């Protein structure tokens, strides 16, 4: 077990101290109660107070949701363990006033028991304070399994499923609880009475009474309770748990790991089996909306709040929750797939909340919560500003269509037009074929040695060099027949552009600028005094210029344990051969030149074995890079060695 903690037995109290010491908006109740409240609690006793809590390990829940327009206080049990009734009672006693107190409880036996006992204690010890409990039970997975409806694509009996679902009471409370905090917290902030808040919740939010709030999750790993020191279950690299809770327990089914699109589709398809939206056509929807508007006064009277017209039947609040250690990259991909699929199903996502909101310690995975907007006041309540540290600063308003999120620039071919000058410099068709073969040999060698370069890079870098150079090579090969190799200045510019489109880390940058400078230098040298012809000497000097471009960009030189330790001696040898040939009457011996350059590249690559890296990511490792050949230098050696297979 690796965790940044002190004593496993003190993690909760020390965590609370971390929260409260870092924010003047929070106070910790003195004593061993693990209770945290708003620092302005004494000024808001004329409003309904909201208290939530449960086991720790779900942070930022629930301390992170204490603040204006959210919770008044929170009670923390041990990790994944319910707080005691006494702790909860002390929280109520600390902050509740004449307007009463609502306890927001996730539907677990321990939490229900402790909060219910605390409420009962208040009847005799705090008789002037009305205390009510609402239970959040938004998780649908275990019920679908009991109804044998999980992964069943037959939707003919949807209403029957919903009726049975509503009658079953042992659903878990998970990430949808965060939306309950926000909406009810907003109502309390507006000064609504306890009855008004309860009626609004039961009519528009309650998972068990309205079915409007549903959640389902998927886990890619378990988690480790500090006091236990080992995971509660294990998953191999190709497995995932569907429909799990937030306490490190198994899901309802262990399945093969799927791509994000399939995971999201499975979660949403199951959520929509319960969510009471209508599949009616637009005319029916309009009729329903008219009926809803006509009955709006009845709706307002039923909840006691003037809350505006009922929302459209397929408008949603979507909450995508990080269960603990899912990367932001994965979260963004899942968000994209979620929005695309909901749009495909005809839903409008009015608000999107994403982030680490209700965790299961360090579990990898996500959950998706859908709240059907049956009243537009819900949107206003979600939008209310809060200083609660766990609520995202930005509640997002997604585009209704993906196309609306794309910036389209006017297309023109001006970038091709300005390259016409580069195309004016030509070599013979035969030499163009030789150049093409050289490029192909280099690309093929990098593709064939991808794994070797990756393994080498893992020892001193981030392990992506082999894959990067393989991808660049494949992209060049894909365009190989569209490149006019008898026009070398344009050819090298084209190769640079291909690499730029993929880039692939710093190595991609260096290869791109090499070919870009080679193109520019060849053109400038071949057009001096209007000769418009490339000499042998121009080739050598232009290659030197291209190497200098890498030196300038990387601020490196020979001896720094980089690709330059192999590239510089190889290019220097080519340049020397070009100079020697310029003063000779014999034809240029390309194969012999490449043999000499290849030998220099090999010696340069081998020289890095005894070096300590001074540049690049490897430089952060210091002496740990010693006795390991630099992967960038070895890639240059591989490229030059491939040139020896030239047939022309």
Curated annotation (Swiss-Prot):
GO BP term, pick one: glycerol catabolic process
Pfam (any one): Dak2
Alphabetized SMART domains for the sequence: Dak2
Positions of the DhaK domain: 7-391
Catalysed reaction equations from the record: dihydroxyacetone + ATP = dihydroxyacetone phosphate + ADP + H(+); D-glyceraldehyde + ATP = D-glyceraldehyde 3-phosphate + ADP + H(+)
Chain residues that bind ATP: 462-465, 506-507, 554, 562-563, 630-632
Entry keyword set: ATP-binding, Kinase, Lyase, Nucleotide-binding, Transferase
Location of the DhaL domain: 433-645
GO MF entry, a single one: glycerone kinase activity
Cellular-component GO terms for this entry: cytosol
Family in the record: Belongs to the dihydroxyacetone kinase (DAK) family.
Function per UniProt: Catalyzes both the phosphorylation of dihydroxyacetone and of glyceraldehyde.
Stated name of the protein: Probable dihydroxyacetone kinase
Organism: Dictyostelium discoideum
High-level lineage: Eukaryota, Amoebozoa, Evosea, Eumycetozoa, Dictyostelia
């Amino acid at each position: 077990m690796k965790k940044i903690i002190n004593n496993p037995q003190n993690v909760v109290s020390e965590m609370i101290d971390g929260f409260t010491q870092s924010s003047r908006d929070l106070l910790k109740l003195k004593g061993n109660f693990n209770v945290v409240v708003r620092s302005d609690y004494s000024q808001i006793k004329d409003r309904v107070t909201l208290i939530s809590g449960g086991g720790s390990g779900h942070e930022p829940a629930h301390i992170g949701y204490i603040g204006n327009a959210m919770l008044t206080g929170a009670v923390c049990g041990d990790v994944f363990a319910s707080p005691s009734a006494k702790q909860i009672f002390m929280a109520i006693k600390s902050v509740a006033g004449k307007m009463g107190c609502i306890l927001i409880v996730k539907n677990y036996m321990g939490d229900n028991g402790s909060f219910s006992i605390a409420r009962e204690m208040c009847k005799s010890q705090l008789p002037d304070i009305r205390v009510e409990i609402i239970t959040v039970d938004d998780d649908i997975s275990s019920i679908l399994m009991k109804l044998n409806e999980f992964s069943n694509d037959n939707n003919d009996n949807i209403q029957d499923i919903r009726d049975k679902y509503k009658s079953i009471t042992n659903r878990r409370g998970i990430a949808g609880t965060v939306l309950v905090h926000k909406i009810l917290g907003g109502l309390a902030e507006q000064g609504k009475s306890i009855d008004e808040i309860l009626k609004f919740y039961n009519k528009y939010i309650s998972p068990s009474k309205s079915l409007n709030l549903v959640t389902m999750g998927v886990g890619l790993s378990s988690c480790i309770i500090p006091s236990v020191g080992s995971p509660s279950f294990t998953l191999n690299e190709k497995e995932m748990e569907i429909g799990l809770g937030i306490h490190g327990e198994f899901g309802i089914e262990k399945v093969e790991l799927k791509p994000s699109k399939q995971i999201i589709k499975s979660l949403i398809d199951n959520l929509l089996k319960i969510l009471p939206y209508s599949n009616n056509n637009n005319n029916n929807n309009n009729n329903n909306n008219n009926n809803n508007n006509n009955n709006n006064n009845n709706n307002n009277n039923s909840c006691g709040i003037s809350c505006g017209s009922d929302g459209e039947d397929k408008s949603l609040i979507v909450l995508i929750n990080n269960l603990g250690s899912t990367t932001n990259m994965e979260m963004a991909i899942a968000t994209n797939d979620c929005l695309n699929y909901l749009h495909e199903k005809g839903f409008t996502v009015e608000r999107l909340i994403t982030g680490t909101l209700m965790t299961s310690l360090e579990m990898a995975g996500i959950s998706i919560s859908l709240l059907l907007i049956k009243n537009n006041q819900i949107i206003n309540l979600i939008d209310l500003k809060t200083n609660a540290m766990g609520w995202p600063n930005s509640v997002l308003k997604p585009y209704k269509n993906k196309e609306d999120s794309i910036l389209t620039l006017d297309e023109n071919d001006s970038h091709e037009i300005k390259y016409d000058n580069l195309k004016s410099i030509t070599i013979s068709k035969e030499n163009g074929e030789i150049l093409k073969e050289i490029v192909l040999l280099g690309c093929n060698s990098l593709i064939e040695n991808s794994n070797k370069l990756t393994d080498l890079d893992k020892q001193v870098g981030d392990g992506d060099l082999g894959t990067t150079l393989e991808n660049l090579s494949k992209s060049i090969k894909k365009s190989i027949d569209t490149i006019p190799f008898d026009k070398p200045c344009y050819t090298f510019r084209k190769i640079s552009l291909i690499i730029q489109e993929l880039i692939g880390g710093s190595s991609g940058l260096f290869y791109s600028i090499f070919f870009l400078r080679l193109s520019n230098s060849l053109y400038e040298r071949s057009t001096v005094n209007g000769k418009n012809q490339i000499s042998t000497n121009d080739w050598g000097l232009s290659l030197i210029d291209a190497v200098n471009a890498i030196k300038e960009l990387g601020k490196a030189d020979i001896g720094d344990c980089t690709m330059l330790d192999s590239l510089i001696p190889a290019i220097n040898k080519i340049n020397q051969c070009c100079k020697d040939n310029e003063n000779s009457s014999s034809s240029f011996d390309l194969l012999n030149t490449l043999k000499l350059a290849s030998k220099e590249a090999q010696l340069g690559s081998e020289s890095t074995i005894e070096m300590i890296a001074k540049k690049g990511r490897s430089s952060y490792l210091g002496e740990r890079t010693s006795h390991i050949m630099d992967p960038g230098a070895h890639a240059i050696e591989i490229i030059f060695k491939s040139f020896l297979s030239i047939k022309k």
